[in-house]
Amino acid sequence: MKKLVLLVFVFFCSCHSNKKEENNSKAQLNSQQILPPQPYFLDIKVNDVKLGEPVFGDWLFSHKEKGQSFEQFVRTKHVVPTKEEDIIYLKPIGQFNSSQLKQIELVRQYLQIFFQLETKVLENASNDIIPNHARRIGDVGQEQFLAGYILTDVLKEDSPDKRIALMAITEKDLYPKPEWNYVFGLASYRDKIAVSSIYRMQKEADFNLCLDRLLKICSHEIGHMFGLHHCIEVNCVMNGTNSMVETDRHSIRLCSLCQRKLNTGFKYDNVKRLKELEKYFKDNNLAEGLQVTKKDLKSIQ
C-alpha cells in the first residue's frame, strides 16, 4: 500500500547544516563578535505571534526540532550573495494556462522584494525533457514526474549567469519514490536547487489562495537555501508544515529573528523592503500579507 504523503516538501538534504560544514566553519566563526540586534528588529518583535502547543497532524507534533538561534546561524556556514552569485532563478516546466503564468510572474516579483535580490524567470521548458522512466500515472489518473530526476538531471547542471538559487515550478504532480503517492516538492539545499508543483495548489478556483501558497512555499524553500532553519517559536513563513492546511494557517511573514538572520549576509535596507512588500500585497489584494506588513511598518515609526 502506498504511503500517504503529508509533507509539503521531502528534503533531499537536511534543513540543518551537516556536521562537516559546521566543523569546517566553527574555527573561523567561533570568535566572531555577535552584535546586539538593530532597533528595527527589536521594534518589529512585538508583532511576532507565539506558536501554540502542536497538536496531532502538525509538523512540530511529529518533528521534535530544536530550532536555530541567531548565534547558531551566524556561526554556521551559509550562502550569502556575492558579485558572482546574486540572482534567483525560477524555471517553469510544462504547459501553463494564463492564470498560472501570471502567478509565476507574481512569484518572481515577490521573491525579488522578499530577498532583495534580482529574480528572473527562465525560458519555459517542455514536459518532453522528462523521460518515460521518470514518469508514471498517479492514483487518480494524473500524470506524475519523479521529483528527484528534475533535481539531479535537469537543475543540477543548469547554471544560468550569476545563479545563487534555482527553483523549478511544474504544472504536473510530483512523486519522490515509487511507494509514495505524491509530494508537493523536493529540494537539495547543498546544491541550492528545488522543484515545486502547483498541481495540488490549483484545486480551488481561488487565484489569490493559490498565489499565497506559492509565495509561502517558494520563499520558505529559498530561505532554507540561505541557511534559515525551521522557526519553532513564533508564527513565521519558516515554520515547518505537514499539510496544505497547515501551510494556509501559517503566516507569510518572516519573523523578527529570521529577518535578522537573513539581513546579516544580505545587508539590504529593512524599511525599503517593508514598504515594497506593503505595495506588493496591496496591489495584489493579499489581505493577510498586507495586514502583517502594516503592523511592522507602524512599529518602526
Please provide the spans of the model-predicted regions.
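Metalloprotease/metallohydrolase-associated module, dominated by Zn2+-dependent proteases
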Residues: N23-P54, F184, D191-E204, D212-R213, ...
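Short loop/turn motifs enriched for small/polar and acidic residues
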Residues: K91-I93, T170-K172, T241
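N-terminal low-structure segments adjacent to metalloprotease catalytic domains
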Residues: C15-D158, A165, L274-Q301
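Sec-dependent N-terminal signal peptides
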Residues: L4-F12
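A structure-centric signal for secondary-structure junctions around beta-strands
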Residues: E84-I87, R163, R190, I252
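Active-site-proximal segment of zinc-dependent metalloprotease catalytic domains
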Residues: S159-M225
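Short, well-structured alpha-helical interface segments that form or flank functional binding sites
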Residues: K102, L106, L209, R213, ...
